[in-house]
Every structure is written in C-alpha cells, then in structure tokens.
C-alpha cells in the first residue's frame, strides 16, 4: 500500500503542477493517472488501497461538505436575491429531469436509476468555478452587477442540494419502489439532520467561545464529530433516517455564523486537508473506472446523454436570470460558468458501484466522462470568454478620471 501511495502522491504532484501550468484542471490528470495505475491498464495500485477507497471517498465528502458550510455566506444570498437562490437548485433540477427523461430511452436503466445518475451528474464544481470567480472579482470583471458573487453563492448551495438528492434517490433505487413511506422518509431525514446539525453547531460554538483551543485541535474536534454523526446515521438506519450530511453542513454553517474567527481557522486547516484528499479522491476514481466499458457503445451513449443534460441545465440556468438586468453576453457567461463538473461526481460517483447497485458501472462511468468532458470545457470557456462577455469596472474609473 505504501508504495502505491508514494506513486500516487509523487506522480500526482508533478503532473498536477504541469497541468496547472498549461491551464488544464489538474483533476483531469489525477483521473487519467488513476486509470493508468489501476486494473484497467498497468494494475500497479495495491489491492489494500482499493479496498479502503470507499472510506477515503467518504472522508473526502465530509471535508467537501464541511468546507461548503464554512464558506456559505447567508448575507450573499440576501444581497444577490432571487437569481442566486434559483442558481442553487434550478439548473441541477433541469439536468436531473433531462437525464430522467432520456436515460431510460438511451441506456438499459429504469427511471429511479436515471434519477440517481442525474443526481450524480448535476452538480457544478466549486473547485473549478470559485477560484476563477475570485480572480474575476479581483480584476474587476462583472463586479458592476455582482456576477462573480452570484455564481459563487449559487454554486456553493448547488452541491449541497444535489448530494442530499443523491442519497434520497439511492434509497429509492435500493428498494426499487416508490411509496408513501419512502417519500416521507426523504424530508424526515433532512429535517432530523438539520435539527441535529443545529444542536451540535450551537453547542460547539458555545464551547469554542468559552475555551481557547488551537486550530489543529479545533479541526480534529469538528472532524471527529462529523465522523460521529455519520456513524449515528448508520447505527439508526433500521429505525429512523437521519441525513448526517445535512447535519455536517448545518454544523459548519452555525460555527461560521456564530464564531467567525474559529470558523476561519478551521476553514484554513480543512483547505489543507482537501489538498491531500483531492489528489487521492480523483486518482481513486480513475482506478475504479472500467476503461473497456467507457470505450464501449454505452460510453458513447453516455457522452450523448451528458450533452443532452447540459442543454437542459443551460436552459435552467437561463430561466434563473429572467427578470434580471443582465445582458445577453453576461447571461451567456453565467451559463458557461455552470457547466464544469468535478468534485461531487468524484466523491459520490463510485458509491452505487461499491454498494452493488445494478447501474453502478454506468453511474461511475458517467461521472468520470462528465468530469473529463466538462471540467476542461467549462474552465476554458470561463478563462477565454470573461474579458469579452463581462464589463470591467475599471472602465468607469478611467472615464471619470478623463472627464
């Protein structure tokens, strides 16, 4: 296992730096590296590392959700208004609808499996979008209408919305039936998860205010409690459904609201943790990918399905901007910004396969193809279009100085 980890980190860091230099998202390289090192090509990765990959992916998901909660700014939603709120769920909803309609027609899957596939593919990638929006904001592009802030606010909630839907749909696929009990269990698990997160968040915030704790210990406490909430969900699943993922997000959000300084310290440490788990996550997704299936006719059909879904998604994104003062060019830029996928697809794409669901291979392959297709496409569209599509605020200052 240790030699495998050495290869993953050594080759991952070197190749990742090269890809960043040529302005291609490094996660693309990580996935390709995993495919090369995995059973599909050279079969170098030790089986013991593959055996614990599902646990590593779950830890990565916990880190993703905690960072989402810590970075979620409620004031941004108040400031951005209706468009930011709609961006947090409407494009993803349209994409899921598109896949639910066309998935059963094009692939050998039922409606529930198509919904599950849609929930995996529907999330936008903050890992690609957020750094670029920060860069735009610093350069003054789109600031006159707060476009970078609107996109960041919507994208942060988009992931949370899709992940909650994924776990809800997974329950439907596992039972393969849709009845009143299964329908009621979805909002109940969310409400219970929300309640647990609020209680734990307020208690932790109170303790953190009363006791001076260094940032490393703060991180260990929050991470340990997150593990505990996931374990609680597993222990109680035969009696009551609790969404531990919602609990983790809400806990992090409460800490950030009521103890901003401590929240920022935890955020910094979690960002460092993510650097490690990002590499592991995407490489292990590549390792789990069945290249023969991806290159088969079903793989080609998945590419077509993803493109159809992106059309649905883009239509949903356009609807969110109806009634705003955004120009055609600015609306087009928002559509581009909502195309790239990566983090969520990598963290939940293999879960269906690990749990033995019939559509597991299709879902994982779809997740990988969506990353390889949309991550570089979205990144390049953002990078090469923003100067043409967005207004630069400095122009106003220059006009004032000249006059």
PLM region descriptions:
Residues 1-403:
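Transmembrane helical cores of multi-pass secondary ion antiporters/exchangers
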């Amino acid at each position: 296992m240790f030699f495998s980890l050495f290869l993953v980190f050594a080759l991952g860091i070197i190749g990742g730096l090269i890809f960043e230099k040529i302005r291609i998202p490094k996660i693309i390289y990580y996935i390709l590296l995993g495919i090369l090192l995995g059973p599909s090509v050279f079969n170098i990765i030790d089986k013991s590392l593959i055996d614990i990959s599902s646990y590593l992916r779950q830890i990565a998901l916990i880190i993703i959700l905690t960072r989402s909660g810590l970075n979620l700014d409620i004031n941004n939603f108040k400031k951005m208004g209706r468009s930011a709120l709609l961006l947090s769920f409407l494009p993803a909803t349209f994409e899921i609808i598109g896949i639910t309609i066309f998935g059963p027609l094009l692939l050998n899957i039922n409606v529930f499996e198509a919904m599950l596939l849609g929930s995996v593919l529907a999330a936008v990638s903050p890992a690609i979008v957020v750094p670029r929006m920060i860069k735009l904001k610093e350069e003054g592009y789109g600031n006159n209408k707060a476009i970078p802030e609107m996109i960041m606010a919507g994208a942060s909630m988009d992931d949370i919305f899709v992940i909650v839907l994924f776990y809800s749909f997974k329950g439907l696929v596992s039972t393969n039936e849709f009845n009143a009990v299964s329908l009621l269990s979805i909002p109940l698990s969310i409400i219970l998860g929300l309640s647990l997160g609020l209680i734990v968040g307020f208690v932790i915030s109170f303790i953190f205010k009363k006791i001076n704790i260094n940032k490393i210990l703060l991180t260990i406490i929050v991470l340990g409690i997150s593990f505990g909430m996931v374990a609680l969900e597993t222990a109680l699943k035969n009696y009551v459904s609790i969404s531990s993922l919602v609990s983790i997000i809400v806990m992090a959000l409460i800490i950030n609201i009521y103890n901003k300084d401590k929240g920022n310290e935890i955020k910094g440490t979690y960002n460092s943790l993510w650097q490690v788990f990002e590499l592991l996550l995407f490489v292990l997704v590549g390792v789990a990918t069945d290249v023969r299936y991806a290159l088969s006719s079903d793989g080609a059909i998945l590419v077509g399905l993803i493109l159809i879904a992106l059309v649905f998604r883009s239509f949903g994104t356009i609807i969110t901007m109806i009634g705003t003062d955004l120009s055609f060019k600015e609306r087009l830029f928002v559509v581009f910004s909502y195309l790239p996928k990566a983090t969520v697809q990598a963290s939940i794409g293999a879960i269906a396969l690990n749990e033995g669901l019939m559509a597991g291979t299709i879902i994982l392959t779809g997740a990988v193809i969506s990353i390889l297709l949309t991550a570089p496409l979205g990144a390049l569209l953002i990078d090469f279009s923003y100067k043409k599509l967005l207004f630069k605020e400095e122009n106003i200052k220059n006009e004032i100085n000249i006059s």
